[in-house]
Amino acid sequence: MTGRVTAFSDKRGVGEITGADGTVYWFHCTRIAGGTRVIDPGTDVEFEVVPGHRGRWEADAITPRS
């Protein structure tokens, strides 16, 4: 799926991606591909949607689009 990072907290290591379908997906910095732990809001990304904690869907395998 494609989307855009709409929020990210360096301090907490968590953020949100708004998918192309308009759904907001939570993510933890460990889900960013390539070993980096930070990503800027506004970055266009590709990601997978996986079942997460508390029954919500979350973003995984997050890769910035070039």
Regions found by a protein language model. Give the residues of each.
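Structural detector for short beta-strands of small beta-barrel domains
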Residues: 1-10
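Conserved positions in beta-strands of structured domains
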Residues: 6, 18, 48-50, 60
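A generic structural motif
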Residues: 9, 33, 63-66
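Short aromatic-glycine-enriched beta-strand elements
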Residues: 11-17
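Beta-strand/loop nucleic-acid-binding surfaces
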Residues: 23-36
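Short nucleic-acid-contacting surface segments enriched for D/E, G, S/T with interspersed K/R
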Residues: 33-46
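OB-fold/S1-family single-stranded nucleic acid-binding modules
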Residues: 50-66
